[in-house]
């Protein structure tokens, strides 16, 4: 798995997978995308946009932040999943927070390889 492929697996869900509610969405997606074993990932953000539109942030769709980091010019639909306090694997229960914000990502070779934060 390349760094770009890992970025896609962990952070891109487009079109957004259906779930009865946002908490169920996070619980299902975190498991489905392999982020609950061997340990539960504490927090993770899914971007509901195509890989191509996110990749534009690495070029004309973004502005340099620091190092390899770039800030998106446009806002994206996001779902941020946060592990509920004191939870242990394998039952990683997540809280969910939906928002529309700009994103800060790291790019290498013109491809996104790391999600830094929403801004």
UniProtKB/Swiss-Prot annotation:
PROSITE patterns: RNASE_PANCREATIC (PS00127). InterPro entries: RNaseA, RNaseA-like_dom_sf, RNaseA_AS, RNaseA_domain. It comes from the Eukaryota. The active site is at residues 11, 114. It catalyses: an [RNA] containing cytidine + H2O = an [RNA]-3'-cytidine-3'-phosphate + a 5'-hydroxy-ribonucleotide-3'-[RNA]; an [RNA] containing uridine + H2O = an [RNA]-3'-uridine-3'-phosphate + a 5'-hydroxy-ribonucleotide-3'-[RNA]. GO terms for molecular function: lyase activity; nucleic acid binding; ribonuclease A activity. Pancreas. Keywords: Disulfide bond, Endonuclease, Hydrolase, Lyase, Nuclease, Secreted. Its EC number is 4.6.1.18. One of its GO terms (biological process) is defense response to Gram-positive bacterium. It is found in: Secreted. It holds the Pfam family RnaseA. GO terms for cellular component: extracellular region. Disulfide bonds join 26-81, 40-92, 58-107. Substrate binds at residues 6, 9, 41-45, 82. Monomer. Interacts with and forms tight 1:1 complexes with RNH1. Dimerization of two such complexes may occur. Interaction with RNH1 inhibits this protein. Belongs to the pancreatic ribonuclease family. Endonuclease that catalyzes the cleavage of RNA on the 3' side of pyrimidine nucleotides. Acts on single-stranded and double-stranded RNA. This is Ribonuclease. It comes from Chelydra serpentina (Snapping turtle).
């Amino acid at each position: 798995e390349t760094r770009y492929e890992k970025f896609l697996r962990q952070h891109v869900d487009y079109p957004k997978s259906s779930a009865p509610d946002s908490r169920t969405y996070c619980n299902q997606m975190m498991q489905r995308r392999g982020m609950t074993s061997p340990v539960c990932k504490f927090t993770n953000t899914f971007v509901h946009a195509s890989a191509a539109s996110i990749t534009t942030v690495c070029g004309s769709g973004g502005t340099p932040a620091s190092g390899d980091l770039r800030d998106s010019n446009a806002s994206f639909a996001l779902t941020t999943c946060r592990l509920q306090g004191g939870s242990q694997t394998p039952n990683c229960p997540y809280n969910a927070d939906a928002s529309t914000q700009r994103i800060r990502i790291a790019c290498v070779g013109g491809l996104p390889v790391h999600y830094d934060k929403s801004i």
